[in-house]
């Protein structure tokens, strides 16, 4: 009798056949791999064959799942995700070891498929490999792009765009609910676009939509193509690269037109002319010929991408969560409004220069960063050399994830009311968000911390101050503040699962000038 082998005839049969084949190849590779001494890895949940701990992260939000597991297995926890070694850090002591004591050892970034596409093959500052190229980009960013003087130069842009937001809200009918989420996204896009590119570029909706979908892919949990790097076919079967490339093309078209238009405008501009945007600064450096590593157009686009991710998504997320917490905690909102309205009493508008005196507002912002860090799992690091942390072996190439969200809610550092929104906890507290206090890391710490901190905070401060000065806020009829849904959405940036709809009531200051 002759055996007959039939090809799969339906998509489901192909999927089953492909999955079985891939699992067989992974198992075979594991069996044939030479045995090495077992390292003293950090504790962690029991691993299953082939998949490790992947099953324990599926179906939830990664930073929340990791916090729950760390409460069982400890603040330095080992997870095996497919073929990859991962260590999750959930204590300030361990975070300090990673981000300060051994910062150089953990200065590398893991190469992830989504990041490769979004960052133009790791040409940006966030994901570029640690080395001379990254050092040059970091220097350019800190000195030329996001230095305090440069951020201050964008004050007029921030004031104009937030004034437009106020006027837009005033245009709604009395008692009408507004989609605050979409409005703050649009405002932060306007600020970032004008600061980076000189004007608000067409395609705002397409850009924001593409960016949201990309950030979802970045933080949506486990990418099987990343988890099994030895199985090259997974990059094709998973479809993740195709999806992200399609989204990236939408953004790239905008960046291409931005650079080309700037080049045309520069032909008629005198050298040394002021009011340069960030693209102008980068083109000046490109044309100067003074850099050790020349700036290509690809690098310029990658840096612009970083600016938009930091300026749009993270600033909007912080402002959205802050307003959500104020709605949920009306006594805090009243206190913040009283301070702002007393400071600007009799004035028709707010001047950014006077925001430094709003001490309670600064506490509100700090508390928002604590409970809702924009990046809950700090951008992953990778161990460059095998080392020992707190007595545990950390093999080379291990992926390190610092759970800033978990530490910000840990009762060990913040007391039994750690889950409560209470700005007063920062009164007379030396804790700040500049990366020196390792239980509080909204912008990370060390040489690979976020360079856009000053830009982001400035965007949030002026927007919130104007929104609280010009309007009173409430939920729709029948909705109770304490019942406001605060569920998070999966993504690289922490956003609300449901968009925030709230009702503004214009406030008219007495004797306004």
Curated annotation (Swiss-Prot):
Q: Where does the UniProt annotation locate this protein? A: Membrane
Q: Which reaction does it catalyse?
A: (-)-casbene + reduced [NADPH--hemoprotein reductase] + O2 = 8-hydroxycasbene + oxidized [NADPH--hemoprotein reductase] + H2O + H(+); 4-hydroxycasbene + reduced [NADPH--hemoprotein reductase] + O2 = 4,8-dihydroxycasbene + oxidized [NADPH--hemoprotein reductase] + H2O + H(+); 4,8-dihydroxycasbene + reduced [NADPH--hemoprotein reductase] + O2 = 4,5,8-trihydroxycasbene + oxidized [NADPH--hemoprotein reductase] + H2O + H(+)
**Any Pfam family:** p450
Keyword Mitochondrion listed: no
Where, by residue number, does heme bind?
450
In terms of PROSITE patterns, this protein maps to:
CYTOCHROME_P450
* GO MF annotation, one: iron ion binding
Keywords (alphabetical) are: Heme, Iron, Membrane, Metal-binding, Monooxygenase, Oxidoreductase, Signal-anchor, Transmembrane, Transmembrane helix
Entry-linked Gene3D superfamilies: Cytochrome P450
Residue stretches spanning the membrane: 12-28
At the top of the EC hierarchy, this enzyme's class is oxidoreductase
Q: What is the topology of this protein in the membrane according to its UniProt annotation?
A: Single-pass type II membrane protein
**Entry's SUPFAM superfamilies?**
Cytochrome P450 (SSF48264)
The keyword Oxidoreductase appears for this protein: yes
Q: Which domain of life is it from?
A: Eukaryota
Q: Which GO terms describe its biological process?
A: terpenoid biosynthetic process
Listed cofactors? heme
Sorted alphabetically, which CDD domains does this protein's record hold?
CYP71-like (cd11072)
Entry function: Involved in the biosynthesis of macrocyclic lathyrane type diterpenoids (also called Euphorbia factors) natural products, including the cyclization route from casbene to jolkinol C, a precursor for ingenol mebutate that is used to treat actinic keratosis, a precancerous skin condition. Catalyzes the hydroxylation of (-)-casbene and 4-hydroxycasbene to produce 8-hydroxycasbene and 4,8-dihydroxycasbene, respectively. Also mediates the formation of 4-hydroxy-8-ketocasbene from 4,8-dihydroxycasbene. Together with ADH1, triggers the biosynthesis of 8-ketocasbene from 8-hydroxycasbene.
Membership in a protein family:
Belongs to the cytochrome P450 family.
The name this protein carries in UniProt is Cytochrome P450 71D445
- State the organism named in the record: Euphorbia lathyris (Caper spurge)
